[in-house]
Amino acid sequence: MKALFIGGTGTISTAISTKLLEDGHELWLINRGNRNTALPPGAHIIQADIGDEEDVSRRLEGQSFDVVVDFIAFTPQHLERDYRLFHGRTKQFLYISSASAYQKPLSDYRINEGTPLANPYWEYSRNKIAGEELLMKLYREEGFPVTIVRPSHTYSERSVPLGLHGTGGSYQVIKRMMEGKKVIIHGDGTSLWTMTHNTDFAKGFIGLMGNIHAIGESVQITSDETLTWNQIYRAIADALGVELRACYVSSAFIAASAPKSWDLRGALLGDKSNSVVFDNTKLKRLVPDYTATVRFDQGVRMAVDYVLNHPECQREDAEFDRWCDRVIEAQEEALAKVRKEG
C-alpha cells in the first residue's frame, strides 16, 4: 500500500506511521520539517507547507496514492484545498474528525456513529462537523472516496492525558502531584470517560486504510475501557508513587474562571465533562481483529516514565499553577464561610 500523510508526526499519526513502515508499506509525508527528529526513518519526505497549494501540487505531479490522510485539517477550507490536490490522485481520503463533534449536551451517554453532531460550546468541534459535511457532499456528488475517522482522547508516551491543563501541557499537573499539592478535577470525578493509547488507535486506523467497505463511512476509534475521572487521576498518582489530593470544582466554574486562551469552555463543557461510553461495533465490523489491548493504568505508567526521563517533555506552566492555587483557595474559603455562617 502506498500512503501519503499530511503531518505524520503528531500523537495519533506517529504510531500509525511507525506501524505502517514496520509492516512494509510505502509511506510518504508532506511535512514542513520543523520536527525532524520525529520523522519516521524509512518514510519518503516531501518537505513543504501544505498551505502552499501551488508548490505542493507541483511536487505531487505524476504521483498517485492508495490512501491519503490529512492529520492537520481543521476547517472546511483546508479540506477544499485537499480535494483540489487529491481528487483523481487517491483511492481513499481519510479525514481525522473528532468525537467531540457529537451532540452536546448528550441525550444518551452511549455514543455511536449515529449520534447527532452538534456542539455549541466548541468552535473546534463545529469546524470538524463542517468538514465532515463538506466531505460527504463531495462523496455523494463527486465520488470523492472519503472515510471519516472520529478519535476521542488519544494519548502517547510523550504526554500524560488529563481532564484540564493550561497552554503549557500536562506536566504542571504532574509536578503539583509530586509536590503534594492539590490538583483540580472537574465535577466530582464520577463522570465516565475513555482514554485510548495511540498504538491501539493505530491498529484500528490501519484496518480502515485501503478498506473498500469504509468508503463513504464515518467510524469512531476508541478503547472499550470506561473509566471515571477519579480512576484516571488515581492511576496517574499511582504511577508517580504519590497520594492523590483532589479538589473538585464544577466544570462551569472552571470554564468561567480560566483564561479564554485555554479554551476550557470547549474542552470541558463541550467534551470532557460529559459522561460517554463509546460503542465500537461499527469499527469491529469493518476491522474484525481490532482489539484495544493497552489498559489505561499500563499506558499511563509508560507515559509517566517517559516524561520523567525526558526533560524536553517537562514544560512548566507558572500561569496555570497560580490559577490552580487561586481556584482552590477560593473554593476552600467559600466552604469555610458557609460552614461558619451555618
Question: What do these predicted regions represent?
Answer:
Residues 3-23:
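N-terminal Rossmann NAD(P)H-binding glycine-rich loop of SDR-like oxidoreductase domains
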Residues 30-34, 49-50:
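N-terminal Rossmann-fold cofactor-binding loop
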Residues 41-52, 72-73:
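Rossmann-fold cofactor-recognition segment
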Residues 63-110, 126-137:
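NAD(P)-cofactor binding segment of oxidoreductase domains
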Residues 109-113, 117-133, 153, 163-171, ...:
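Short-chain dehydrogenase/reductase
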Residues 133-163:
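Conserved beta-loop-beta element that borders a ligand/cofactor-binding pocket
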Residues 165-173, 186-209, 216-217:
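Substrate-positioning beta->alpha
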Residues 207-268, 280, 285, 302, ...:
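Mid/C-terminal beta-alpha module of Rossmann-like enzyme folds, strongest
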